[in-house]
Amino acid sequence: MSRNQQLFDRAQQTIPGGVNSPVRAFRSVGGTPRFITRAEGPYMWDADGQRYIDYIGSWGPMIVGHAHPEVVRAVQETAAHSFSFGAPTEAEITMAEEICKLVPSIEQVRLVSSGTEATMSALRLARGFTGRDLIIKFEGCYHGHADSLLVKAGSGLLTFADTTRNAPSSAGVPADVTRHTMVLEYNNVEQLEQAFAKHAGEIAAVIVEPVAGNMNLVRASDAFLQAMRELCTRDGAVLIFDEVMTGFRVALGGAQAHYGIRPDMTCLGKVIGGGMPAAAFGGRRDIMASLAPLGGVYQAGTLSGNPLAVAAGLTTLKLIQAPGFYDRLAAQTRKLADGLAEAARAAGVPFSADAVGGMFGLYFRDGVPASFAEVTQSDTSRFNRFFHAMLDHGVYLAPSAFEAGFVSAQHDDAILDATFDAARKAFAAA
């Protein structure tokens, strides 16, 4: 029995399903999860000593690669002065100033510890600011596991939930909790216009992943985001970009810089923690003024602005501002997507791939999907076979056909060539 299997068997005795986040259980693809012991650069090693080229990157944060020496040093130096204070620090101010500088739509920002906290707090703030209740979200978009957002959501819910019903995607969420959440089709401008016409003056906020990454990778169209911006402005609704995944990942200023659309509020996470638990929400100064202790919208967190996370995040934000960083990252990610598509064509496998900045999507279907419905037309059985074949050849992809992948600055041409070699063998087996 492998060491990975031994650990999985042991974990299931004390941890529900043996994991602390459902997608890690390999339920979607089958088989035994890999228990990771260490990581460096573009590589991870499991409990059996197997090395993998990593295309998960902790689901996005590891944009400069694992265990970057400067990030490690910053965390070590900070840890020498204690792990947490429960009081303000100067580093928090520096982090806030850096975020506001790099994302101009954010005039003020509040640090939290997870993406779920960021989106949950942003929606509460939008409702408090507008005095309205109704929220619009989109099919397949995942905004964390807050109750009101678990309706036709993406990520692990595409494996575990019934996505055909316009009802809570998770047990334990009363229908009453989600009755103020309207779910529309991603990239459907007409449906969005109809919703605003029918519910004029009632909509508190529209929340969207401008590049969806939790139903695999799906780009928003320019027309979709532009219509969203115009409708929110006209109706007085708050436009929230959930950039927990795309922030500092698809461009230095996030997806909003990529598209040239200015939201009212933005949620950030992943990259801003450099691999440590950190997230943030921010936006217009007048909206943020409604937040306690200034206003009546309450939000708090014992570990918000944690010194270790801020140290890792600030160092990562410094590294990604190096000249040409995003040009190189986008070029390598596009090269990966194109190379995998070419390998699939050579093997006669129906397949398409897409890339935005440092994110990519792999689809076992003809054509790149533009909606949740199109994503679900992918051949998941074929993906599962491909996933395991790649794993056997030392390439670690997301263990689900409904998750985006991530490239780091450490994925050089040699790493991509090794990936293509593995893919040619894997497509033959798929």
Curated annotation (Swiss-Prot):
Q: SUPFAM superfamilies from the xrefs?
A: PLP-dependent transferases (SSF53383)
- Feature: compositional bias, Polar residues: 1-15
Q: What is its EC number?
A: 5.4.3.8
| Gene3D superfamilies for the chain | Aspartate Aminotransferase, domain 1, Type I PLP-dependent aspartate aminotransferase-like (Major domain)
Which pathway does the protein contribute to?
A: Porphyrin-containing compound metabolism; protoporphyrin-IX biosynthesis; 5-aminolevulinate from L-glutamyl-tRNA(Glu): step 2/2
Q: Which cofactors are required for activity?
A: pyridoxal 5'-phosphate
- Which superkingdom is the protein from? Bacteria
Isomerase is among the record's keywords = yes
- PROSITE patterns from the entry? AA_TRANSFER_CLASS_3
Q: What is its main location?
A: cytoplasm
Q: Is Isomerase one of the keywords UniProt gives this record? A: yes
Question: Region (Disordered) spans which residues?
Answer: 1-21
Its recorded reaction(s) are: (S)-4-amino-5-oxopentanoate = 5-aminolevulinate
Q: Which UniProt keywords apply?
A: Cytoplasm, Isomerase, Porphyrin biosynthesis, Pyridoxal phosphate
Q: Which NCBIfam families match?
A: hemL (TIGR00713), PRK00062.1 (NF000818)
UniProt lists the family membership as follows: Belongs to the class-III pyridoxal-phosphate-dependent aminotransferase family. HemL subfamily.
Q: Subunit info?
A: Homodimer.
Query: Can you say what this protein is called?
Result: Glutamate-1-semialdehyde 2,1-aminomutase
Source organism (scientific name): Cupriavidus taiwanensis (strain DSM 17343 / BCRC 17206 / CCUG 44338 / CIP 107171 / LMG 19424 / R1)
**Lineage, opening ranks:** Bacteria, Pseudomonadati, Pseudomonadota, Betaproteobacteria, Burkholderiales
Q: Which gene encodes it?
A: hemL
